Amino acid sequence: MSKILIILPTYNEAENLKHIISQLRDLNLEIQILVVDDNSPDGTGQIADSLTSQDLFVLHRAKKDGLGPAYLEGFTWALDRGYDFIVEMDADGSHLPAELESLLKAANATDLVIGTRWMPGGKVANWPWYRRAISRFGTSYAAMVLRLPYKDLTSGYRVLSKQLVRKVLEANIQTHGYGFQVELVLLAHESQMVIAQVPITFLERSKGKSKMTGRIVVEAWLKTTILCVSRLLNRR
């Protein structure tokens, strides 16, 4: 039986963590959970510690250092313990645990499954128009300049094979924010790995504060542009 690990990066998710953990535990799936907390001042790390058991583990990081580094540390932890599939998932309730099974089914024949908002069957609930516009423009821009045929490059609900995770760690990706997700897909695509897209429903958080900032958006845009230029130069 495949070993499956869900990685939940957290920063100030005290209002959401117990609920998402409870929902995951209610699934009839053989899964384990790793909370990677960036020293949340609201006590998220301590809440995670109180929930530890045979199916839940916690990594405490010294400071808030971004999504990418949190996942990279979680990936290393997962490979060291022999997991076959690693799930990326938000801890704020935006990603529905009930949809995890459909992603895992697709993972049996692929290296990367992208939970996709912007495809038939996918949708976004409770987002203002400007958040939709930023997300649609960002993923469309990245897909265009990087020539990638995927509909949701910044999606944070994914399943990765251990082979892809190993490649990601070897690549030493430096991006901290959502650009990390774009770079990960590019790496999988250029490595000729099998990639699938599965529709998901994305819910805007009802508690806590979004981590999306102008700085994160700019970093993702700049990183995508740099990756595009780098690819063009390497072809010469």
Language-model features and meaning:
Residues 37-46, 93:
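A conserved acidic beta->alpha catalytic loop
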Residues 1-4, 145-148, 170-236:
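Hydrophobic helical membrane-anchoring modules
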Residues 12-26:
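Short, well-formed alpha-helical segments that are part of the catalytic scaffolds
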Residues 2-4, 25-35, 43, 55-56:
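Short loop->beta transition adjacent to catalytic acidic/histidine clusters or analogous donor-positioning motifs
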Residues 8, 30-40, 59-60, 89:
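Short beta-strand/loop segment that forms part of the nucleotide-sugar
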